[in-house]
């Protein structure tokens, strides 16, 4: 059984990330270079071209916000995570997979990110898998690289929906 209203299509599934889209620091509004991300630091990023005065800003930032963390490459346990990173810099959705709260707490020594709403904890050195709390699955990772000018860029969109579970996730 389902509601007879229109299906959302791919609107819930896709974000503004696409191949070549620059990662922009949310605090400075400047494109990020690998040298801007120190080992053990947490930086928040958004796609280039997303402006606060845009009509759909809140909707788009809720799906596209990233946590950028630089880990020592030998501390990354998940093979895909390492392949999708650049020199140990990983990009994960900032949106908790439990109820969609923004994750903002990071513990350098353990590489754990904590959602302040219900304490779901994710191991960012192991594919952002859930290690504690009510979140049902890992944070989606965005594949990143560096363009010819030396800026961090997306190599596509997330390969799975961002945020909490919804009708399409199975």
UniProtKB/Swiss-Prot annotation:
Name of the protein described by the UniProt record: Cytochrome bc1 complex Rieske iron-sulfur subunit
List, alphabetically, the InterPro entries matched. Rieske_2Fe-2S (IPR017941), Rieske_2Fe-2S_sf (IPR036922), Rieske_Fe-S_prot (IPR014349), Rieske_Fe-S_prot_C (IPR005805)
How is this protein organized at the quaternary level?
A: The cytochrome bc1 complex is composed of a cytochrome b (QcrB), the Rieske iron-sulfur protein (QcrA) and a diheme cytochrome c (QcrC) subunit.
Top-level taxon of origin: Bacteria
Where is it localised? Cell membrane
Q: Where does [2Fe-2S] cluster bind?
A: 96, 98, 115, 118
Keyword Transport in annotation: yes
- GO molecular function ontology, one term from the record: 2 iron, 2 sulfur cluster binding
Q: Single GO cellular component annotation?
A: plasma membrane
| Taxonomic source organism | Streptomyces lividans
What does the note accompanying the cofactor annotation read? Binds 1 [2Fe-2S] cluster per subunit.
Query: Which UniProt keywords are listed?
Result: 2Fe-2S, Cell membrane, Disulfide bond, Electron transport, Iron, Iron-sulfur, Membrane, Metal-binding, Oxidoreductase, Respiratory chain, Transmembrane, Transport
Spell out the Gene3D superfamilies in the cross-references. Answer: Rieske [2Fe-2S] iron-sulphur domain
Which residue intervals define the domain Rieske in the entry?
63-153
Q: Recite the lineage of the species.
A: Bacteria, Bacillati, Actinomycetota, Actinomycetes, Kitasatosporales
Q: What does this protein do?
A: Iron-sulfur subunit of the cytochrome bc1 complex, an essential component of the respiratory electron transport chain required for ATP synthesis. The bc1 complex catalyzes the oxidation of menaquinol and the reduction of cytochrome c in the respiratory chain. The bc1 complex operates through a Q-cycle mechanism that couples electron transfer to generation of the proton gradient that drives ATP synthesis.
UniProt membrane topology term:
Multi-pass membrane protein
> Which residue pairs form cystines in this protein?
101-117
- Please state the protein's primary subcellular location: membrane
Cofactor(s) the protein requires to work:
[2Fe-2S] cluster
């Amino acid at each position: 059984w389902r509601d007879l209203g229109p299906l959302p299509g791919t609107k819930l599934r896709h974000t503004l990330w696409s191949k070549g889209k620059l990662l922009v620091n949310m605090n400075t509004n400047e494109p990020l270079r690998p040298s801007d991300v120190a080992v053990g630091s947490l930086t928040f990023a958004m796609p280039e071209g997303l402006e606060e005065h845009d009509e759909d800003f809140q909707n788009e930032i809720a799906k596209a916000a990233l946590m950028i963390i630089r880990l020592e490459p030998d501390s990354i346990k998940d093979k895909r995570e390492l392949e999708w990173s650049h020199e140990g810099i990983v990009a994960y959705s900032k949106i908790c997979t439990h109820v969609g709260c923004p994750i903002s707490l990071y513990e350098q020594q353990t590489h754990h990110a904590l959602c302040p709403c219900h304490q779901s904890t994710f191991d960012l050195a192991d594919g952002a898998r859930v290690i504690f709390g009510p979140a049902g699955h890992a944070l989606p990772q965005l594949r990143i690289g560096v363009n010819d000018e030396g800026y961090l860029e997306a190599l596509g969109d997330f390969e799975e929906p961002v945020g909490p579970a919804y009708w399409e996730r199975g």
